[in-house]
UniProtKB/Swiss-Prot annotation:
UniProt KW Zinc-finger keyword: yes
Pfam family, any one: zf-ANAPC11
Higher taxonomy: Eukaryota, Fungi, Dikarya, Ascomycota, Taphrinomycotina
CC annotations in GO: anaphase-promoting complex; nucleus
Gene designation per UniProt: apc11
Domain of life: Eukaryota
UniProt-listed Gene3D superfamilies: Zinc/RING finger domain, C3HC4 (zinc finger) (3.30.40.10)
GO-annotated molecular function: cullin family protein binding; ubiquitin protein ligase activity; zinc ion binding
First and last residues of each zinc finger (RING-type): 35-78
Native source organism of the sequence: Schizosaccharomyces pombe (strain 972 / ATCC 24843) (Fission yeast)
Assembly information from the UniProt record: The APC/C is composed of at least 13 subunits: apc1, apc2, nuc2, apc4, apc5, cut9, apc8, apc10, apc11, hcn1, apc13, apc14 and apc15.
Key words of the record: Cell cycle, Cell division, Metal-binding, Mitosis, Ubl conjugation pathway, Zinc, Zinc-finger
Function, as annotated: Component of the anaphase-promoting complex/cyclosome (APC/C), a cell cycle-regulated E3 ubiquitin-protein ligase complex that controls progression through mitosis and the G1 phase of the cell cycle. The APC/C is thought to confer substrate specificity and, in the presence of ubiquitin-conjugating E2 enzymes, it catalyzes the formation of protein-ubiquitin conjugates that are subsequently degraded by the 26S proteasome.
GO terms (BP aspect): anaphase-promoting complex-dependent catabolic process; cell division; positive regulation of mitotic metaphase/anaphase transition; positive regulation of mitotic sister chromatid separation; protein ubiquitination; ubiquitin-dependent protein catabolic process
Protein name as catalogued: Anaphase-promoting complex subunit 11
Length: 94
């Protein structure tokens, strides 16, 4: 028996590789949503891992670091915030 496919409508779902129900430490919005500056999640609203292992929306941490009171520190642990290399850091944590 042969089956001929006439149409195919694929549906996909994506999520960030973050702990379940985790939220941005600055805006308190889940990572599967978008930060207050953005209108849609995904490429327009990426997330950033710090070497300290804290995760933020890119826009949120950029705005935080731009304030004079932040002194370039992570808002969660006050270490100097440095963006982690995504390939090396992700393999170390797995």
């Amino acid at each position: 028996m042969k089956v001929k496919i006439l149409r195919y409508h694929a549906i996909a779902n994506w999520t960030w590789d973050t702990p379940k129900d985790d939220v941005c430490g600055i805006c308190r919005v889940p990572f599967d949503g978008c930060c207050p500056q953005c209108t849609s999640p995904g490429d327009n609203c990426p997330i950033v891992w710090g070497k300290c292992k804290h995760i933020f929306h890119a826009h949120c941490i950029q705005n935080w670091l731009a304030t004079s009171g932040s002194q370039g520190q992570c808002p969660m642990d006050r270490q100097t915030f440095v963006v982690a290399d995504s390939t090396n850091e992700k393999s170390e944590t797995q």
